[in-house]
Amino acid sequence: DIGSTIRCPYHRWGYGTDGRLVSAPLFDSVPREDFDRGDWGLVPVRVETWGPVVFACLDERTPPLGEWLGDLADRMSGYGLEEWRPIALTASPHDGDASAAATSTSTCTFDVAANWKLVAENFAEYYHLGWVHPQLAKVSRVKDHYRYQGPGMYCGQTTTPVSGDQRDDWLTLPPASGLDHSDATSGRFVTLFPNVLLSVLPNHVFVVLLEAVTAGRTIEHCAFLFPPGPATDPVPPAAVVRAFEVTRRFWIEVNDEDIDICERAQRGLSRGGVPPGPLAPRFEEPVNRFHKMVADLMTLESMTDLSVPPGDRPGTADRYGTALNPAPPHVEASAPESG
């Protein structure tokens, strides 16, 4: 069955979906007694999933995904992200609104002339928010930012409440059902080490996967995800299509602003001669957490020695100037206070 065979494009060796080598064209024209197909199957790769992301790992010594995520899966369990989908939205011809009949894509890629770590660090901090992202700052206001990180290989922040303010177009998108008060009123912004950037809103998610190409080049693979409901119907309502298009353009505008500032920073770093500046504790502590993860993985002799970082302690001990969240996620609301 050719349809169930994985073919190498070079010499056309064929593999079954279980990884076994099933054909090696012309290889036996000169027989070899030391050749056993059973020895030459595809290399097994660890694959696990969480939410909308598939994770592949080439190092068997790396901790399992559940340990890597720490409490992140529990933190975001209320969203039911495993059911959210990236789709192409097309307005119904029966909406009576021809202007909404265009198709919008929910995936896109960007070529960034900057190191992947710089892109991730930029996402992890909000010190630049008011100056680089004037429109985003109307929805995700600096004064409403709080830390959002427990044990796990991630760093994060939340905007609570996330506000329509002067940009309420996205509110037309139907929210996920069953959200608690904290999830329903917040925006979560998580850097899952090393290369997954998540912007999680009550009614949509913007996912960015960073592909490190060279020391000065990164490809961003982006997708918009939607919860089950009108946005994922085969023919969604015209109002939803319009809201998605406005939301898509908004996030691409924000991402373009990030790309510009990261590329400018990359040019400065590449020239050398300027020492790095201090981190602003309130706004950039997640960057310090990210730096420690990079340093750990650069200096460990083996992944078996990796220690997944703990989270912020409850109370104010680790807040570095950030106030307590008025509507904390359930994993923080249920934690005991400490000083």
Explain the meaning of each model-derived region.
Residues 1-60, 66-74:
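Rieske [2Fe-2S] iron-sulfur-binding domain
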Residues 46-48, 53-339:
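C-terminal catalytic domain of Rieske-type non-heme iron oxygenases
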